[in-house]
Swiss-Prot record:
Lineage: Bacteria, Pseudomonadati, Pseudomonadota, Alphaproteobacteria, Hyphomicrobiales
Domain of life assignment: Bacteria
Family in the record: Belongs to the UPF0301 (AlgH) family.
Transmembrane segments: none
Alphabetical list of NCBIfam families matching this protein: PRK00228.1-4 (NF001268)
Name by which UniProt lists this protein: UPF0301 protein BBta_6966
Taxonomic source organism: Bradyrhizobium sp. (strain BTAi1 / ATCC BAA-1182)
Length: 216
């Protein structure tokens, strides 16, 4: 994770042209995207993505239901020299069990922490809505390791990005549905259940969707 606090704004500006968070009528900041069977991109099959930024210039989001391989949070802390081997036993439960997810195919070597709004670093934390923030500095990982971090958090490696107009086209082509974000769903422990939970939130029976996809 790059410790440069300015990178958060740089990433946001890169894909949206906006440096700070503002509300934009018609855009989907702070909503969930739920992939449909007609998506056609295996990288996003059955994915649930939290949209951190959306404007006329593009969009960026974090996938919240795809584990990042075999690495766990304590191993990542050791790789970043935040803790040493053997210190894992002294980590708080919140750090020991924190999820490490694949956030998307862009910048997969970088970490993005989605977290509850009870933790905030000036000039480093992006407030997306009243319940969810995004921080990309190493300071939040140190705080979590010490038990001083946010109440709810997940670490994602990489993010999903769309050029200007691309997300709108994919939604129009029925590749995505979207709905209001639910912090309990975003930060829930059962990663494998998030897709079905998101479908039910929209009002879709997951079984019916699976059957329809099988007969497409």
């Amino acid at each position: 994770m790059n410790p440069d606090a300015k990178r958060l704004g740089d990433v946001r500006r890169k894909v949206t042209g906006i440096g700070d968070h503002t509300s934009h009528g018609g855009y989907l900041d702070g909503q969930l995207l739920v992939a449909m069977p007609v998506m056609g991109d295996s990288r996003f099959e059955r994915s649930v993505i939290y949209l951190c930024a959306h404007s006329a210039e593009g969009a960026m989001g974090i996938m919240v239901n795809r584990p990042a391989g075999s690495i766990d949070f304590p191993q990542l802390l050791m790789q970043l020299n935040i803790i040493e081997k053997g210190d894992q036993i002294s980590l708080p439960d919140s750090a020991e069990t924190m999820k490490v997810l694949s956030g998307g195919p862009v910048d997969t070597g970088r970490g993005f922490v989605l977290h509850s709004s009870d933790y905030f670093i000036a000039n480093a934390t992006l407030k997306i809505n009243d319940g969810v923030c995004l921080t990309t500095t190493i300071d939040i990982l140190k705080a979590i390791a010490k038990g001083n971090g946010p109440k709810h958090a997940l670490l994602a490696l990489g993010y999903a990005g769309w050029r200007a107009g691309q997300l709108e086209e994919e939604i129009q082509d029925n590749g995505w549905l979207h709905c209001d974000a639910d912090p309990e769903l975003i930060f829930g422990d059962n990663v494998e259940d998030k897709y079905d939970l998101a479908l039910r939130k929209i009002g879709i029976d997951p079984g019916m969707l699976s059957n329809a996809a099988g007969h497409a």
